[in-house]
Amino acid sequence: MYNDEFELTFDLADAGPKKEQRRPTLPEPEEAVVAAPPVQETREMPVSAAPENTPASEPEREPEPAAEPQSTAPAVKDRTVLISGGDRGIGAAAARAFYAAGYRVAVFYHTNAEAAAALQKELPGVLAVQCDVASRASCELAFRAAEQALGRVDVLVSNAGIAQQKLFTDITPEEWQRMLDVNLTGAFNLCQLALPGMIRRKAGRILTVSSMWGQTVGSCDVHYSAAKAGLIGLTKARAQEVCPSGITVKCVAPGVIDTDMMASFTAEDNAALAEETPVGRLGTAEEVAKLLLYLAGEDAGYITGQVFGVNGGLVI
Protein backbone atom coordinates (compact mmCIF):
# COMPACT_ATOMS: atom_id res chain seq x y z
CA MET A 1 0.00 0.00 0.00
CA TYR A 2 1.16 3.51 -0.53
CA ASN A 3 0.49 6.74 1.24
CA ASP A 4 -1.17 9.40 -0.94
CA GLU A 5 -0.04 12.30 1.25
CA PHE A 6 3.38 13.83 0.68
CA GLU A 7 5.00 17.22 0.95
CA LEU A 8 6.77 18.51 -2.16
CA THR A 9 9.09 21.39 -2.90
CA PHE A 10 9.74 23.38 -6.02
CA ASP A 11 12.00 26.13 -7.28
CA LEU A 12 10.61 28.52 -9.87
CA ALA A 13 13.50 30.99 -10.10
CA ASP A 14 14.71 31.46 -13.63
CA ALA A 15 18.09 32.88 -12.65
CA GLY A 16 20.40 33.30 -9.70
CA PRO A 17 20.99 30.88 -6.88
CA LYS A 18 18.08 28.53 -6.45
CA LYS A 19 16.38 28.12 -3.13
CA GLU A 20 14.15 25.23 -2.33
CA GLN A 21 10.54 25.91 -1.33
CA ARG A 22 7.92 23.51 -0.20
CA ARG A 23 5.13 22.84 -2.58
CA PRO A 24 1.99 20.74 -2.23
CA THR A 25 1.13 17.61 -4.13
CA LEU A 26 -1.24 18.08 -6.96
CA PRO A 27 -4.64 16.51 -6.25
CA GLU A 28 -7.37 17.74 -3.93
CA PRO A 29 -10.43 20.16 -3.23
CA GLU A 30 -13.38 21.49 -1.42
CA GLU A 31 -16.93 20.96 -2.43
CA ALA A 32 -18.27 23.42 -4.94
CA VAL A 33 -21.63 24.91 -4.07
CA VAL A 34 -23.69 25.99 -7.05
CA ALA A 35 -26.64 28.16 -6.18
CA ALA A 36 -29.63 28.37 -8.48
CA PRO A 37 -30.09 31.81 -10.08
CA PRO A 38 -32.69 33.96 -8.31
CA VAL A 39 -36.12 34.10 -9.91
CA GLN A 40 -37.01 37.56 -11.18
CA GLU A 41 -40.65 38.57 -11.20
CA THR A 42 -42.31 40.72 -13.88
CA ARG A 43 -44.89 42.90 -12.17
CA GLU A 44 -47.54 45.14 -13.72
CA MET A 45 -47.56 48.75 -12.56
CA PRO A 46 -50.94 50.10 -11.39
CA VAL A 47 -52.94 51.98 -14.05
CA SER A 48 -53.61 55.61 -13.20
CA ALA A 49 -57.20 56.83 -13.41
CA ALA A 50 -57.87 58.42 -16.80
CA PRO A 51 -60.30 61.25 -17.63
CA GLU A 52 -63.71 60.19 -18.94
CA ASN A 53 -63.66 59.16 -22.62
CA THR A 54 -59.85 59.12 -22.49
CA PRO A 55 -58.26 55.70 -22.88
CA ALA A 56 -56.05 54.67 -20.01
CA SER A 57 -52.37 54.54 -20.79
CA GLU A 58 -50.74 51.14 -21.11
CA PRO A 59 -49.28 49.88 -17.81
CA GLU A 60 -45.53 50.14 -17.55
CA ARG A 61 -43.67 46.87 -17.32
CA GLU A 62 -40.27 46.04 -16.01
CA PRO A 63 -37.86 44.94 -18.75
CA GLU A 64 -37.57 41.22 -19.33
CA PRO A 65 -34.47 39.72 -17.72
CA ALA A 66 -31.68 38.92 -20.13
CA ALA A 67 -31.68 35.33 -21.28
CA GLU A 68 -29.03 33.10 -19.74
CA PRO A 69 -26.39 31.98 -22.25
CA GLN A 70 -27.13 28.46 -23.43
CA SER A 71 -24.59 25.77 -24.23
CA THR A 72 -24.63 24.46 -27.79
CA ALA A 73 -24.06 20.93 -26.46
CA PRO A 74 -27.04 18.58 -26.18
CA ALA A 75 -28.33 17.70 -22.75
CA VAL A 76 -26.41 14.89 -21.07
CA LYS A 77 -28.47 11.71 -21.40
CA ASP A 78 -27.45 8.26 -20.28
CA ARG A 79 -23.75 9.09 -20.04
CA THR A 80 -21.42 7.46 -17.53
CA VAL A 81 -18.14 8.86 -16.27
CA LEU A 82 -15.51 6.78 -14.46
CA ILE A 83 -13.08 8.74 -12.27
CA SER A 84 -10.04 7.08 -10.70
CA GLY A 85 -8.85 8.62 -7.44
CA GLY A 86 -12.36 10.00 -7.11
CA ASP A 87 -12.80 9.81 -3.35
CA ARG A 88 -11.21 13.18 -2.56
CA GLY A 89 -9.31 16.12 -4.00
CA ILE A 90 -9.56 16.87 -7.68
CA GLY A 91 -11.23 13.51 -8.25
CA ALA A 92 -14.03 14.21 -5.76
CA ALA A 93 -14.53 17.71 -7.19
CA ALA A 94 -14.82 16.15 -10.64
CA ALA A 95 -17.35 13.63 -9.33
CA ARG A 96 -19.49 16.48 -7.99
CA ALA A 97 -19.24 18.45 -11.24
CA PHE A 98 -20.21 15.52 -13.47
CA TYR A 99 -22.97 14.47 -11.07
CA ALA A 100 -24.46 17.98 -11.13
CA ALA A 101 -24.36 17.90 -14.93
CA GLY A 102 -26.47 14.73 -15.01
CA TYR A 103 -23.86 12.02 -15.56
CA ARG A 104 -23.94 8.62 -13.94
CA VAL A 105 -20.77 8.60 -11.84
CA ALA A 106 -18.43 5.80 -10.76
CA VAL A 107 -15.35 6.52 -8.67
CA PHE A 108 -12.38 4.28 -7.94
CA TYR A 109 -10.63 4.69 -4.60
CA HIS A 110 -7.53 2.95 -3.27
CA THR A 111 -7.62 2.79 0.54
CA ASN A 112 -9.87 5.61 1.80
CA ALA A 113 -13.18 3.75 2.07
CA GLU A 114 -14.49 6.32 4.57
CA ALA A 115 -14.08 9.21 2.12
CA ALA A 116 -15.67 7.15 -0.65
CA ALA A 117 -18.66 6.35 1.56
CA ALA A 118 -19.04 10.02 2.47
CA LEU A 119 -19.09 10.95 -1.22
CA GLN A 120 -21.77 8.33 -1.89
CA LYS A 121 -23.88 9.76 0.93
CA GLU A 122 -23.45 13.27 -0.47
CA LEU A 123 -24.21 12.19 -4.05
CA PRO A 124 -26.89 9.46 -4.00
CA GLY A 125 -26.43 6.95 -6.79
CA VAL A 126 -22.66 7.35 -7.14
CA LEU A 127 -20.85 4.02 -7.36
CA ALA A 128 -17.59 3.66 -5.39
CA VAL A 129 -15.29 0.72 -6.14
CA GLN A 130 -11.98 -0.15 -4.47
CA CYS A 131 -9.15 -0.34 -6.99
CA ASP A 132 -5.36 -0.25 -7.03
CA VAL A 133 -4.75 1.20 -10.48
CA ALA A 134 -1.19 -0.17 -10.48
CA SER A 135 -2.63 -3.70 -10.51
CA ARG A 136 -4.04 -4.91 -13.83
CA ALA A 137 -6.15 -7.55 -12.09
CA SER A 138 -7.61 -4.98 -9.68
CA CYS A 139 -8.43 -2.64 -12.59
CA GLU A 140 -10.17 -5.41 -14.51
CA LEU A 141 -12.36 -6.37 -11.53
CA ALA A 142 -13.24 -2.76 -10.72
CA PHE A 143 -13.94 -1.83 -14.33
CA ARG A 144 -16.21 -4.84 -14.76
CA ALA A 145 -18.11 -3.88 -11.59
CA ALA A 146 -18.62 -0.34 -12.89
CA GLU A 147 -19.92 -1.54 -16.25
CA GLN A 148 -22.28 -4.05 -14.64
CA ALA A 149 -23.71 -1.43 -12.28
CA LEU A 150 -23.91 1.63 -14.53
CA GLY A 151 -23.53 0.40 -18.09
CA ARG A 152 -20.97 1.53 -20.63
CA VAL A 153 -18.21 3.99 -19.75
CA ASP A 154 -18.53 7.06 -21.98
CA VAL A 155 -15.93 9.23 -20.23
CA LEU A 156 -12.79 8.09 -18.41
CA VAL A 157 -11.00 10.51 -16.09
CA SER A 158 -7.64 8.95 -15.19
CA ASN A 159 -6.83 10.98 -12.08
CA ALA A 160 -5.33 8.60 -9.51
CA GLY A 161 -1.75 9.36 -8.59
CA ILE A 162 0.87 9.52 -5.86
CA ALA A 163 3.75 11.88 -5.14
CA GLN A 164 6.92 11.79 -3.09
CA GLN A 165 9.63 14.28 -2.17
CA LYS A 166 13.07 12.73 -2.25
CA LEU A 167 16.53 13.45 -3.61
CA PHE A 168 17.22 11.55 -6.80
CA THR A 169 20.20 9.78 -5.25
CA ASP A 170 17.99 8.55 -2.39
CA ILE A 171 15.17 7.11 -4.53
CA THR A 172 15.12 3.33 -4.28
CA PRO A 173 14.37 1.13 -7.30
CA GLU A 174 11.15 0.08 -5.56
CA GLU A 175 10.04 3.70 -5.08
CA TRP A 176 10.87 4.52 -8.68
CA GLN A 177 8.86 1.55 -9.93
CA ARG A 178 5.89 2.28 -7.67
CA MET A 179 5.72 5.88 -8.92
CA LEU A 180 5.64 4.71 -12.53
CA ASP A 181 3.17 1.91 -11.76
CA VAL A 182 0.58 4.22 -10.21
CA ASN A 183 1.02 7.44 -12.18
CA LEU A 184 1.71 6.02 -15.63
CA THR A 185 0.87 2.32 -15.80
CA GLY A 186 -2.38 3.00 -13.92
CA ALA A 187 -3.54 5.26 -16.75
CA PHE A 188 -2.41 2.66 -19.29
CA ASN A 189 -4.47 -0.03 -17.54
CA LEU A 190 -7.69 1.97 -17.37
CA CYS A 191 -7.40 3.33 -20.89
CA GLN A 192 -6.89 -0.14 -22.34
CA LEU A 193 -10.01 -1.34 -20.54
CA ALA A 194 -12.14 1.63 -21.62
CA LEU A 195 -11.12 1.76 -25.28
CA PRO A 196 -12.71 -1.43 -26.70
CA GLY A 197 -16.24 -0.28 -25.86
CA MET A 198 -15.55 3.26 -27.07
CA ILE A 199 -14.16 1.93 -30.36
CA ARG A 200 -17.25 -0.24 -30.90
CA ARG A 201 -19.51 2.77 -30.30
CA LYS A 202 -17.29 5.14 -32.31
CA ALA A 203 -17.45 7.63 -29.43
CA GLY A 204 -15.67 8.34 -26.17
CA ARG A 205 -13.72 10.81 -24.09
CA ILE A 206 -10.50 10.03 -22.22
CA LEU A 207 -9.08 12.67 -19.87
CA THR A 208 -5.79 12.29 -18.03
CA VAL A 209 -4.62 14.36 -15.07
CA SER A 210 -0.90 15.03 -15.25
CA SER A 211 0.89 17.95 -13.56
CA MET A 212 2.76 21.12 -14.36
CA TRP A 213 5.77 19.15 -13.07
CA GLY A 214 5.33 16.90 -16.09
CA GLN A 215 5.69 20.00 -18.28
CA THR A 216 8.64 21.48 -16.41
CA VAL A 217 10.76 20.18 -13.51
CA GLY A 218 10.57 20.26 -9.73
CA SER A 219 13.34 19.68 -7.24
CA CYS A 220 13.40 16.49 -5.20
CA ASP A 221 10.76 14.66 -7.20
CA VAL A 222 12.47 13.37 -10.33
CA HIS A 223 10.46 10.14 -10.37
CA TYR A 224 7.18 12.08 -10.05
CA SER A 225 8.09 14.50 -12.85
CA ALA A 226 9.21 11.63 -15.08
CA ALA A 227 5.96 9.72 -14.58
CA LYS A 228 3.79 12.79 -15.21
CA ALA A 229 5.79 13.69 -18.32
CA GLY A 230 5.26 10.13 -19.52
CA LEU A 231 1.52 10.56 -19.00
CA ILE A 232 1.55 13.59 -21.30
CA GLY A 233 3.35 11.55 -23.96
CA LEU A 234 0.88 8.70 -23.53
CA THR A 235 -2.02 11.12 -23.96
CA LYS A 236 -0.71 12.65 -27.18
CA ALA A 237 0.26 9.36 -28.84
CA ARG A 238 -3.02 7.70 -27.90
CA ALA A 239 -5.01 10.69 -29.18
CA GLN A 240 -3.51 10.31 -32.64
CA GLU A 241 -4.14 6.57 -32.68
CA VAL A 242 -7.81 6.53 -31.62
CA CYS A 243 -9.09 9.77 -33.16
CA PRO A 244 -10.31 7.99 -36.35
CA SER A 245 -12.58 5.92 -34.07
CA GLY A 246 -14.40 9.02 -32.81
CA ILE A 247 -12.52 9.15 -29.50
CA THR A 248 -10.76 12.24 -28.16
CA VAL A 249 -7.97 12.17 -25.58
CA LYS A 250 -6.95 15.25 -23.59
CA CYS A 251 -4.73 16.07 -20.63
CA VAL A 252 -5.10 18.54 -17.77
CA ALA A 253 -1.92 19.61 -15.95
CA PRO A 254 -2.74 21.26 -12.59
CA GLY A 255 -0.34 23.51 -10.72
CA VAL A 256 -0.49 24.34 -7.01
CA ILE A 257 -4.05 23.48 -6.01
CA ASP A 258 -5.46 24.34 -2.58
CA THR A 259 -6.80 21.05 -1.23
CA ASP A 260 -6.78 18.96 1.93
CA MET A 261 -3.31 17.77 0.90
CA MET A 262 -2.08 21.20 1.97
CA ALA A 263 -3.43 20.89 5.50
CA SER A 264 0.09 20.73 6.92
CA PHE A 265 1.09 24.01 5.30
CA THR A 266 1.07 27.14 7.43
CA ALA A 267 -0.51 30.44 6.48
CA GLU A 268 3.00 31.71 5.72
CA ASP A 269 3.62 28.74 3.41
CA ASN A 270 0.40 29.41 1.52
CA ALA A 271 1.18 33.11 1.25
CA ALA A 272 4.62 32.32 -0.20
CA LEU A 273 3.12 29.91 -2.73
CA ALA A 274 0.49 32.48 -3.74
CA GLU A 275 3.20 35.11 -4.17
CA GLU A 276 5.13 32.79 -6.50
CA THR A 277 1.99 32.36 -8.63
CA PRO A 278 1.50 35.14 -11.22
CA VAL A 279 -2.26 35.40 -10.61
CA GLY A 280 -1.53 35.89 -6.91
CA ARG A 281 -3.42 32.94 -5.45
CA LEU A 282 -3.62 29.16 -5.37
CA GLY A 283 -5.93 27.20 -7.62
CA THR A 284 -8.99 25.26 -6.50
CA ALA A 285 -10.00 21.71 -7.28
CA GLU A 286 -13.33 23.03 -8.53
CA GLU A 287 -11.53 25.02 -11.24
CA VAL A 288 -9.81 21.86 -12.45
CA ALA A 289 -13.09 19.91 -12.28
CA LYS A 290 -14.93 22.49 -14.40
CA LEU A 291 -12.29 22.17 -17.10
CA LEU A 292 -12.56 18.38 -17.03
CA LEU A 293 -16.34 18.62 -17.40
CA TYR A 294 -16.02 20.96 -20.37
CA LEU A 295 -13.43 18.76 -22.10
CA ALA A 296 -15.74 15.75 -21.72
CA GLY A 297 -18.62 17.52 -23.44
CA GLU A 298 -19.70 17.91 -27.05
CA ASP A 299 -18.54 21.54 -27.13
CA ALA A 300 -14.96 20.24 -26.88
CA GLY A 301 -15.37 17.66 -29.64
CA TYR A 302 -12.80 19.35 -31.89
CA ILE A 303 -10.09 19.22 -29.21
CA THR A 304 -7.79 16.23 -28.87
CA GLY A 305 -4.15 15.51 -28.02
CA GLN A 306 -3.77 18.78 -26.11
CA VAL A 307 -2.43 19.59 -22.63
CA PHE A 308 -4.29 22.23 -20.60
CA GLY A 309 -2.36 23.90 -17.80
CA VAL A 310 -4.30 25.04 -14.73
CA ASN A 311 -1.42 26.68 -12.90
CA GLY A 312 -2.10 30.40 -12.52
CA GLY A 313 0.73 31.27 -14.89
CA LEU A 314 3.50 29.30 -13.16
CA VAL A 315 4.19 27.47 -16.43
CA ILE A 316 3.71 29.39 -19.67
Which residues does each PLM region occupy?
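Short, small/polar-rich loop/turn modules that mediate ligand/substrate recognition or access, typified
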Residues: 243, 248, 303-305
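Residue(s) in the substrate-gating loop at a strand-loop-helix junction
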Residues: 211
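Catalytic Tyr-X3-Lys loop
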Residues: 162, 169-188, 203, 207, ...
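Alpha-helical segment proximal to the catalytic Tyr-Lys
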Residues: 196, 240-241, 301
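Active-site helix of classical SDR
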Residues: 191, 227, 235
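C-terminal substrate-recognition "lid" of short-chain dehydrogenase/reductases
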Residues: 188, 199, 203, 281-310, ...
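Substrate-binding pocket helix/loop in short-chain dehydrogenase/reductase
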Residues: 167-168, 175-180, 262, 269, ...
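Conserved glycine-rich cofactor-binding loop
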Residues: 87-88
